[in-house]
Amino acid sequence: MKNIFKDKNIYILSVENDQRDKCKSYLISKKALVEKRFSKKVNIIITSEKTILENKFPVNTATKLGIEIIDYETLSRDIERFIRKTQPTSSNGSTSTTTTTTTTTQKGQIVSFKPTSSTSTTTNVINTTTTSTTSTTTIVDPIISLIVPPSGSNNGSFQIAIFGIGFLAGAGFRIKIGNDNGGGGVFASNYEFHSSTSVLCTIPNLNIKCGQQPIYASNDGGKTFGFPIQFLFFDTSIHRIPTAREQDGMVLKSQLDNLKRAISNIQTMESILMRRISLLNGNHDDSKSIEQIFIQQQNFIESGASQLLLGNGGTTDQLLQSLEGSEYSSTNDDGENDQSDDDDDNEDDDDFVEKNSNQVKEEFSEREIKIFISSPFKDMQLDRDQIVKVVIPRIRKLCIERDIVLSYVDLRWGVTSNQSEQSTGLSMCLKELEKCNILIGLFGERYGWSSQEKQDPKSQQLLQSTLDRAIQDFPWVKNYRDSSITEIEFRMLLNQRQQQRNGFFYFRDPYYLEEVSQMDKNNFVSEGQRSKEKLEKLKQEIIKSPFKSSEYRRPTNLSDVLYEDLEKYIDKKYPSGNCELKGFEKERFLHSVFIKNLTKIYITNENYFMEIDTYLSGSATSSGSGNKSISIGSSINSGLLSSLKNKPVFLIQGESGSGKSSLISNWLKQHKEQHPEDLVVSHWIGASPSSNKFTSILIRIMNEIKNQIEIDQKIANGGSNSSSSSSSSMFSTTSTSSVSWLPEIPDETFESEKIVSEFPQFLQYVMSHPSLNGKRLVLLIDGLDKLDPRENSQELIWFPRNFPHNVKVIVSSIQGSRQSEVLKKRGSHILSILPFTEAERKSMVRLYLQKYAKKLSDQQEIAIAISKSTTNPRFLQLLLDDILVFGDYERLNDRIKTLLRAKNTSELYEIILDRIEKDYDPKAKGLVSEFLKYIWAGRRGVEMSMLSTLLLKKNIDPAEWGSLLVLMEAYITSSSGVISFLNDDISKAVEKKYITTPKIGIEIHTNLAEAFEQSGDLNERKVEEYPYQLLKSENWESLKNTLTNLYVFDKLYTPNHKVDLINYWNVLEKQTKPPKNAAERDDPIPYNCSNEFKAIISRSFIQASGLVISDVWFRVASFLEELSQFDGAEVLYNKCRELYINNSQNIEAAKVDRAMGRMYLTMGQNDKSDSKFRLALSIYTKERGQEDIEVAITLNLLGTLATNRCKFDEAKQILNQAMNICESKYESNVLLIADIAYSLGSVCFVEPNRKLEVAEAYFARSLELTESKVGDMDVAYARILTRLGSLNIEKDTYADAEAFFKAALKIYEARLGIDHSRVSQILRHMISLYEVQENYKMAEQCCIRALAITKKIYGNSHNLVSATQIRQALLYNSMNRKQDCLNLLNEVKVTREKEFGPDHKQVKHIIDLIKEIDKPIVPKAPPPPPPSSSSPSASSLLMKSITSLPIVNGQAVLSVPKPPVSRGPNGIPIPPPPPPTIKLYTNMVSLQSVMKQNVGRIPVAQPTSFNSPVQPPSPRTQQAIQQGQQQRQQVQQQQQQVQQQMSQKVSSLQQQPQQQQQQQPSQGYGNRQNTPLFQQPIFQQQFQQNRIQQPQQQPQQQAYVGDMLAQFDQQKLKRVQNANDRSGASQIVENLIGKKKCSKPVSLVNKGYMEESNQIDMGALFD
């Protein structure tokens, strides 16, 4: 085409933005002038075909003026060619092969039919008919569209299948790999053609460069090539070749894609031919039309499009109408024909963004009411206050009920002095009014600011400049230069009436002036006679207008009148019962409103956005999903990208109020604009009443995915109206059931476990469906920390650990929350939100206030921005919100200073509450304080009905606090009728401000408790709140009665409330009962859970209608067992077993037997436990068979019992049998499999030939399974951690052992309370750990605390208490606190004498132990040397006295004068004689020697001689002795001095054997090589025979299961290396046996609890 555009003025109309930009560039290159608006000077209009057909302005005007009109599609090919020349070639080429262009000329017009690609199904139709020419151009260069497989080895020598368009089978066909069109590269070989669209070829055996390489196709021997497609060559050593199955799948998928393209091409050609027929028919005047000839010849087009000719008589016009409504009609539509003289590019851009940004916003945009309040300022302050503080809250409540969004604009101080100086005030007001759909106008006696008012020249000049500025934006204002600003605002509604806008005008009674003080009256009277006349004229015009107008007496009356009018307006537009949304639609509406509020103002942080985008593109294409990816080298840091790979979840965390939700919502808005092809589903916890339940989250996500897929299908099918016309084609790929393949979605009635299990299956099925090929799903869940804590949701068991490759998940939570900890342990990528910078704060202030048409001065903005408190976004927003409702601009500076005095958000809330009290409780009736105190006192909030009753007792009218409720919607939230605070900061502020004494808090809790007591039904709310309120009100007797109520217990003893029930009893048992007599007053009786329930069961008749009493007693007994109150549990177990047997319920009786066996196992009563287990096993086997799940559970317990009884082979056999049953039939019972794995690991850990690595593997597997099912804060999880701690002690990895123990201790304390038997069990293990490390201080603290807990549970005389006391005494002995040790042992002796008698062996054992510790240690003298033939010389006496001294490191302790050195015959000094052999003692008893022995058995150490036979002196020694005799006189003078020094060292010598004992290498942690006083089997037998049972005490244990680790065979344990080994013996042992190595299973490496537990301050646990 020749250049017809040179020097022409061209106007582009109704063309999409991206095409508009390309067209502009093309026209500029043709030296054309592009006009922004249509005018007479325009020579050519370029527009869409649809706009031409509509023939509206400016097309119709251009036609009359003879201006050329060109269809944009006519130029599209030239424009695309121009763009390709000016921009780098894209890696993905075009997929079209043939372009047919039909050009029609009429009256200088140039019109073209749309060039259609292979993937297009649209057709342009016009009715212009004249001369036509048709030209067809064939593109000979073949185009590649797909390669299978998409990657291969860089070594080559493999085949690939290439699919595309225009392949010509012949010698000239080439496939080239690498380089560009200019030559070079590698050519493929062995071409095997299957069609013109597919070919099989071989990549040659060459070393090709790794990475993405282009592959081209050529039909002319390689001279010219079509557009390339990228192929990934990888290093064979890193990547693998796809399997044959994978390649076959890709080939089939590609064939299906080619079939779809073929159908699309046929449909395209079909539509072109049909249009040509219509044109031919229009160019002839024959009576017989073309379609009739066509029908007579019966040459039907096989695709079925010819049926369009037959519809409704088959006329051409009807044909065109059918085509316009069919799927071939143009989709290039702007939605409405709104082009005018004011149309420009910027407006088009805004329209485009608005229409494509947010579909939800468009869907619910009609459900929004925005009010603009207009009036003169000086005399209408009180009136406007009534609207803002009274009417708006009441109307907002009504809007909430009708699912309507309400907002308002009040510009009392929004026009700052700076804006006034710049004269932008009126323009800003009119712009805000333009966005509103309701105007509320107020008038008193003042007309308002106008030229009629007497004012100084400066004000007059300011008014004129303000009007001039407004005229620039709103030209119609020039007609009202003499009017007041208020009238001009009114005129915008009166003169430009629109259907969607409405107005309410109110005129105050002139007699109100009589109530105004004389001082203020000047602000209320008219400005002058002319102003009065203009005001009266305006009022008359308003009264005659269709808008509502009324009069009111005083400001207080205005609220009633205005509310009534607005209520009628809402009732008419949104009628009650018809407009409310329901179900899924209402959820979508509430979430859309929530998002809209978050996206109004946001200071974009590009770093945050980039990191989220990087996560999404991290591995988008690695799995072949077809998702778009971002170039690593261009815009993504490769290090960050590699760190994001394999990260299942992207976690955004930060402090409360740090802006996490705003970040997600605004990123979401941008992402939808940039990636409309993605499926994006967001869930905002807190947006709706049910949004915090994890089941609702999963169900809503599945529904949203289904809804979006349905919408996408409708859009792809050309809208809902295209179904009928599209069905005429036999090749149509659409159907009315296009989404029928979607699986059924569960609803709220399903069990939570089923919903959780079906959710990942739903995602996997949907995202792998062929119709979603290349789609990516982005899931966003905001506010995980706000989850309802019931059903253990905070452990995120419901949250999938793995997602499909094309699903990306982004979540947010408060930093440090339980949810964040869980996601960190799962390896999620973490983005931490930082505080606001000063620049961000300043921008936030300006933009936030600008949204409400207000602005602060520069000084005020700076004061807020530099404050340290405003670094928190929530703090800053609260401050700005308070400023917005502050109506007095004159005192605004003082208000800002007051707000900035707050150091944190909680203090800011206190200041805000002061303002709310002054505004809404001026008479100090306690409206605000009482309202907030009751919300504070509720555990999970307070019901509105109950709050109304409570406030009514305080003489507060419900209508008053109803408005307050709406007013404070920014601070409170409502969920299912329950009101609660939005965050903890508000609760802290209310507590600090109003709960000033404990008495006030108790009174509030008491009122709530009474309210719950009066409520009839025992619903979930009452079960959750009533005991809590009794606890907080310290009403102990009522709390006891409530907890022992069988109906309440049945509701509380559930997974959701069990922890609460345990905590209630833990607190209650620390209290005492009200005294009934003087004796109880002097000796108060504490509450005891076991005694209270035993008292109930002793009654003759128990009222429990509706409950199965035997089942209830079984549950009570299980609860008492959990509390370690075994005596009461045993009584109740026997009671419910009796009931089951009487009713012939054998299975239930077996359940009781097994539970009792488990309890006896815990108590260490192995014989009773074995009897109960075997009885239960026989019943289950008989009733249900040998492979029932109940049999497996019982076998697991029997295996544990066999392990405790050291029957390890039997234990393995039983446990393997249980495991086989589970793995064959009950794979889903993960917890049971984990428990059996734990039991097998315990056997491997404690058996004689221990296998620590095997045991650790079992424990690791059990830990992994348990965590997947119940999380890492469950008691079952803590039990495994305890065992791993003991195992690591044996492996000498004390740091890991301590971490495991601390993690288990944390769980037990959180779940079971700080005084539970499991806690004492952990503490006893930690005593052993710290004693081995000689950290006696920490060991003592653990021992003291464990002893206190054990005494509380078992009583002072229990055997386990005595054993713990003995461990503490020996610990004191190791700490050289001998007297404390003896005192404690004497206390144990007295206790055992009372229980067993003075002659019992345990008493004698304690006595022997006391004697051994109290006995002074005196070293024995070494044997004398052999007698000499001669008399002893002085030298021999000296040596004898020296050798009698203790030896340390081979030298005598005392220094004595050395005798003269004797020399031999050659002058060589004679060597001294060797020192005599020293006899060592081991009669010191230490904690290490007994800490792992059985309970109640303490070994007494016996002296062991390590001396060797004394050797006779050597000849040299004899010679030295002979020479020493010559010095006898000299030695005798020194002998007396040496003996005196020896006597002074006797006390120090007593300690040396103990030190030597500690320096010896020994075996097993805590075991010494000594001979115990009693052998274990004999001692246990005698102990059982002689033990005296006390009815008041609990049964004595044979071996406490919690101390099972202390029952190992000590002779077979190796001594661990002591951290503070001073003798060097450990080094010798290490050299002999080699250094130990610790190899943890992979699942235990880098566990989060290891680091967390190491940070626990153990000292803080004992404060």
Curated annotation (Swiss-Prot):
<keyword id="KW-0802">TPR repeat</keyword>
<feature type="region of interest" description="Disordered">
    <location>
        <begin position="1500"/>
        <end position="1528"/>
    </location>
</feature>
<dbReference type="GO" id="GO:0080008">
    <property type="term" value="C:Cul4-RING E3 ubiquitin ligase complex"/>
</dbReference>
<dbReference type="Pfam" id="PF13271">
    <property type="entry name" value="DUF4062"/>
</dbReference>
<dbReference type="Pfam" id="PF13424">
    <property type="entry name" value="TPR_12"/>
</dbReference>
<keyword id="KW-0677">Repeat</keyword>
<feature type="repeat" description="TPR 2">
    <location>
        <begin position="1150"/>
        <end position="1183"/>
    </location>
</feature>
<dbReference type="InterPro" id="IPR014756">
    <property type="entry name" value="Ig_E-set"/>
</dbReference>
<feature type="repeat" description="TPR 6">
    <location>
        <begin position="1320"/>
        <end position="1353"/>
    </location>
</feature>
<dbReference type="Pfam" id="PF13374">
    <property type="entry name" value="TPR_10"/>
</dbReference>
<feature type="compositionally biased region" description="Low complexity">
    <location>
        <begin position="1544"/>
        <end position="1563"/>
    </location>
</feature>
<dbReference type="InterPro" id="IPR025139">
    <property type="entry name" value="DUF4062"/>
</dbReference>
<feature type="compositionally biased region" description="Low complexity">
    <location>
        <begin position="89"/>
        <end position="105"/>
    </location>
</feature>
<dbReference type="InterPro" id="IPR011990">
    <property type="entry name" value="TPR-like_helical_dom_sf"/>
</dbReference>
<protein>
    <recommendedName>
        <fullName>TPR repeat-containing protein DDB_G0287407</fullName>
    </recommendedName>
</protein>
<feature type="coiled-coil region">
    <location>
        <begin position="1516"/>
        <end position="1547"/>
    </location>
</feature>
<feature type="repeat" description="TPR 3">
    <location>
        <begin position="1192"/>
        <end position="1225"/>
    </location>
</feature>
<dbReference type="InterPro" id="IPR027417">
    <property type="entry name" value="P-loop_NTPase"/>
</dbReference>
<feature type="region of interest" description="Disordered">
    <location>
        <begin position="326"/>
        <end position="359"/>
    </location>
</feature>
<dbReference type="InterPro" id="IPR041664">
    <property type="entry name" value="AAA_16"/>
</dbReference>
<feature type="compositionally biased region" description="Acidic residues">
    <location>
        <begin position="333"/>
        <end position="352"/>
    </location>
</feature>
<feature type="repeat" description="TPR 5">
    <location>
        <begin position="1278"/>
        <end position="1311"/>
    </location>
</feature>
<feature type="repeat" description="TPR 1">
    <location>
        <begin position="1110"/>
        <end position="1143"/>
    </location>
</feature>
<feature type="repeat" description="TPR 4">
    <location>
        <begin position="1234"/>
        <end position="1269"/>
    </location>
</feature>
<feature type="region of interest" description="Disordered">
    <location>
        <begin position="1544"/>
        <end position="1571"/>
    </location>
</feature>
<keyword id="KW-0175">Coiled coil</keyword>
<dbReference type="InterPro" id="IPR019734">
    <property type="entry name" value="TPR_rpt"/>
</dbReference>
<dbReference type="InterPro" id="IPR051191">
    <property type="entry name" value="DCAF12"/>
</dbReference>
<feature type="compositionally biased region" description="Low complexity">
    <location>
        <begin position="1518"/>
        <end position="1528"/>
    </location>
</feature>
<feature type="region of interest" description="Disordered">
    <location>
        <begin position="84"/>
        <end position="109"/>
    </location>
</feature>
<dbReference type="Pfam" id="PF13191">
    <property type="entry name" value="AAA_16"/>
</dbReference>
